[in-house]
Regions:
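Short phosphate-binding/catalytic loops that engage adenosine nucleotides
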Residues: 88, 105, 130
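Conserved acetyl-CoA-binding loop of GNAT-fold acetyltransferases
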Residues: 125-135
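Conserved acetyl-CoA-binding loop-helix of GNAT-fold acetyltransferases
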Residues: 79, 85-98, 123, 127
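Alpha-helical elements of Rossmann-like donor-binding domains used by nucleotide-donor carbohydrate transfer enzymes
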Residues: 3, 34-35, 91, 95, ...
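Conserved GNAT acetyl-CoA-binding A-motif
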Residues: 100-114, 136
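Acetyl-CoA-dependent GNAT
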Residues: 2-75, 80, 99, 133
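Conserved beta-strand-loop-alpha-helix junction that forms the acyl-donor binding cleft
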Residues: 84, 109-121, 140-143
Length: 143
């Protein structure tokens, strides 16, 4: 997880600066590790799928199926940096979309950042068919 998300955390730190990052974002980054661990608990609503190459885990994607709303969601996901640029992300997201569709979902969603650290993920989401966006901005102020 640390290697896969390192570019994102570095991007956030560069954008926010050390003070805001350490107070406002770093706790969220740390909490992400707990969220990922919780996704493996028996009572989780998340389904986790792992991509392997030659027996090594090189990526993972989590999905949530909401049968009531008919909206599926891609949650935490990552590709090991040593395997980036090989189409693994696009493959994972197409798989996730197919899984959601076969489960009766009518819409698939994913949230991502617009920072440089998320650029590879955004490209892969777009290549796999995610083509409608809501622009969003997260703003901070030092007090």
């Amino acid at each position: 997880r640390q290697k896969a998300f390192a570019p994102v955390f570095a991007s956030f730190r560069k954008i926010l600066g050390d003070q805001i990052y350490s107070l406002a974002q770093e706790p969220e980054d740390t909490q992400q590790g707990k969220l990922l661990s919780d996704m493996f608990l028996p009572e989780t609503v998340w389904q986790i799928y792992v991509v392997e190459r030659s027996g090594d885990a090189v990526g993972f994607v989590s999905i949530r199926i909401d049968s009531d709303s008919k909206v599926g969601e891609i949650g935490l996901n990552a590709v090991h940096p040593d395997y980036s640029g090989q189409g693994i992300g696009t493959e994972m997201y197409k798989f996730a979309s197919d899984k959601m569709k076969s489960s009766g979902m009518q819409v698939a969603t994913v949230a991502t950042g617009s920072d440089p650290g998320h650029e590879p993920a955004r490209r892969a989401y777009e290549k796999s068919g995610f083509n409608v966006q809501i622009p969003s901005v997260w703003m901070c102020q030092v007090l």
